[in-house]
UniProtKB/Swiss-Prot annotation:
GO terms for biological process, alphabetical: NAD metabolic process; NADP biosynthetic process
Superkingdom, natural source: Bacteria
Name of this chain's protein: NAD kinase
Primary role: Involved in the regulation of the intracellular balance of NAD and NADP, and is a key enzyme in the biosynthesis of NADP. Catalyzes specifically the phosphorylation on 2'-hydroxyl of the adenosine moiety of NAD to yield NADP.
Gene behind this protein: nadK
Pfam families per record: NAD_kinase (PF01513), NAD_kinase_C (PF20143)
Organism whose genome encodes this protein: Shigella dysenteriae serotype 1 (strain Sd197)
Main location group: cytoplasm
PANTHER family: NAD KINASE
Length: 292
């Protein structure tokens, strides 16, 4: 065993037997290598592991040096919002579909992870967004997002009228089905489907992408990630929501505004040494191959 990582957390919410098999393989392999291993409580229960150290995501974030997330991007997003609050590195084994955030191939994960544990990896910091639903002199409702914060109707799709302020300066008003506010990490997710630009992860930028705007002039807008975005609503309704990574919903009540800004903390994401963001885009999005 080396000194790069001493305590490793195993994280994920398995949805099919093959994912559970990967969790079990990973646990037993790390134990034979002499690492201290903390298994997320739900995984330990489903695998019926005995005499194993278990913990919540927060406890893994506090105690472990590295968290290995087994699953798809959805599992990674759910875990990363909590793990980003702590000084822990995170890597993923892909047991989902595209796997933009989960680099390791499940068929070769053991060898790839062995190289990472020997210190052969690259690291990067991915910033998160913080969304606040607030009204003057009232308690705020707050959540965070790795990919995007989305304004949308709560139940039935309909046009929303709202105003956008950037650093408290009026930017534009819009009638649309909603608005996607995305990080560079989320620029290959929901934002991309709505016609937003792809941003490389190192950019300190946020994109604002309209959803089906009732105009031909609305276009995605890219702003500095240090900016604060305020959403105000011209016709008060009580059926609007803000969703974070399509996993957490915050209802918007009459008279409330929405504030979106960059979080104070980052996700410490690591990759195998041969990782290339552009190669990932080409592979996942089916871009054309080189001509010569």
């Amino acid at each position: 065993m080396n000194n790069h990582f001493k305590c490793i957390g195993i994280v994920g919410h398995p949805r099919h037997p093959t994912a559970l098999t990967t969790h079990e393989m990973l646990y037993r392999w790390l134990c034979t290598k002499g690492y201290e291993v903390i298994v997320e409580q739900q995984i330990a229960h489903e695998l019926q592991l005995k005499n194993v150290k278990t913990g919540t995501l927060a406890e893994i974030g506090q105690l472990a040096d590295l968290a290995v997330v087994v699953g798809g991007d959805g599992n990674m997003l759910g875990a990363a919002r909590t793990l980003a609050r702590y000084d822990i590195k995170v890597i993923g084994i892909n047991r989902g579909n595209l796997g933009f955030l989960t680099d390791l191939d499940p068929d070769n994960a053991q060898q790839q992870l062995a190289d990472v544990l020997e210190g052969h990896y690259t690291s990067e910091k991915r910033f998160l967004l913080e969304a606040q639903v607030c009204q003057q002199d009232c308690q705020k409702r707050i959540s965070t997002a790795i990919n995007e914060v989305v304004l949308h109707p709560g139940k039935v799709a309909h046009m929303i009228e709202f105003e956008v302020y950037i650093d408290e300066i009026f930017a534009f008003s819009q009638r649309s089905d909603g608005l996607i506010i995305s990080t560079p990490t989320g620029s290959t997710a929901y934002s991309l489907s709505a016609g937003g630009p792809i941003l490389t992860p190192s950019l300190d930028a946020i994109t604002l992408v309209p959803m089906f705007p009732h105009t031909l002039s609305a276009r995605p807008l890219v702003i500095n990630s240090s900016s604060t975005i305020r959403l105000r609503f011209s016709h008060r309704r009580n059926d609007l929501e803000i969703s974070c990574d399509s996993q957490i919903a915050l209802p918007i009540q009459e008279g409330e505004d929405v504030l979106i800004r960059r979080c104070d903390y980052h996700l410490n994401l690591i990759h195998p040494k041969d990782y290339s963001y552009l190669n990932t885009l080409s592979t996942k999005l089916g871009w054309s191959k080189k001509l010569f």
